[in-house]
Each structure stands twice: as structure tokens, then as C-alpha cells.
From Swiss-Prot:
The keyword Hydrolase applies. NCBIfam families: arc_protsome_B. This is Proteasome subunit beta 2. The active site is at 11 (nucleophile). The formation of the proteasomal ATPase PAN-20S proteasome complex, via the docking of the C-termini of PAN into the intersubunit pockets in the alpha-rings, triggers opening of the gate for substrate entry. Interconversion between the open-gate and close-gate conformations leads to a dynamic regulation of the 20S proteasome proteolysis activity. It is an enzyme of class 3 (hydrolase). It is found in: Cytoplasm. The 20S proteasome core is composed of 14 alpha and 14 beta subunits that assemble into four stacked heptameric rings, resulting in a barrel-shaped structure. The two inner rings, each composed of seven catalytic beta subunits, are sandwiched by two outer rings, each composed of seven alpha subunits. The catalytic chamber with the active sites is on the inside of the barrel. Has a gated structure, the ends of the cylinder being occluded by the N-termini of the alpha-subunits. Is capped at one or both ends by the proteasome regulatory ATPase, PAN. PROSITE patterns: PROTEASOME_BETA_1, PROTEASOME_BETA_2. Pfam families: Proteasome.
Amino acid sequence: MLHLKEKLKGTTTVGLVCKEGVVLAADTRASLGNIIYAKNVTKIHKIDEHLAIAGAGDVGDILNLVRLLKAEANLYKSTVGKEMSVKALATLLANILNGSKYFPYLGWFLVGGYDEKPRLFSVDMVGGITEDNYAAAGSGMEFAYSILDSEYREEMSVNDGIKLAVKAINVAIKRDVFTGDGLLVVTITKDGYKEYRGAELEKMLK
């Protein structure tokens, strides 16, 4: 079995709260130790129309949690008649992770969404939860934070948030060998969830 730190290598995820919504961004490289084993892995997952999570860590563990969270969100909506709040989803994830801390899911998560306003939470591997205006996770997080700390501003537009998130990921790509290949950016506003990648993302950055 790979050492825990080795399994957690790879990826950089970023989240920002903007005036009109939340921006999540991630690279698409997946690594196993020092080996690149996939170049087009999706690391941001839609949970509901106004909820998403970005995961850095073991791909299988993250996908297992995504399936569980989607099922819980669907059950909540069918029972209560409305979408789960961002805080409720983050708290549910934190409780699941804390309950399995002796046999942990190997991942660090950013939970973003829009209910009454845009919100972003960071949830660590054992269920520690923090709400903030911006956050990063993964092997390139130090490089991403160097950009976010200096350039993030409150009330920035979603378009500016996309540009800043991409800049933070690109700095990580240049400096962290476990971050690379493609980019996926997600925005969540009152109008819902939208993905940007490839040519569409390039157009947004002009």
C-alpha cells in the first residue's frame, strides 16, 4: 500500500467567493506516486444545480463520497422540497469524514454553492470545516495561495474570479510536478451550475 502522503500527492483545487457566485477550479492530472496515470480526470463534481465539490486526493475515495453526497442531496430535495444549503452539504461531508477518521477517505474538499448567497467551505480529511472567501487544496496549494493572498478582493465579479482562479492553478502547474495537463472551471450563481474548459474557457480569459 502506498504511504498516505504519497496517495495524497497530486492536483491543485481552488475556490473563490465572488459578488454573483462561487468559482471552483482544478487541473485534470492524476498521479500515482511519481507516475502520471491520467491526464483528463474531473475533480469538480456537481451535487445539485447550486452545489458542487472539488476534491484533491485519492480518486476512488473522492468518487465514492460524491455518489453518497448526490444521493443524500436528492433524498433531501425529495423530502423537504428544496435544495440542501451549502453549509448543510459541507457539514454532512464533515460528519462523514469525521466518522471514518480511523479508516479515512483520502481527500481534501472544497464545497461551493449558492443558496441565499455564494458560500465556500474547506473540509479536511478528518472533518475539520472552515468557511472562507477563498481556499486552495492539494499538492500545489502553497503556490495557489501565493496568488490568492495577494490578488483576491471581496466583491470581485465572477469573470474576474475565473481569471484569478486560472492564474492560481497555472502558477501551481509551473511549480508543482503533480499538477498539470488541462483545466476545469465551474461557476455557481443564482442561475445554476456551469462548466468551462478548453476553447470556451480560453474565450472567457480574453
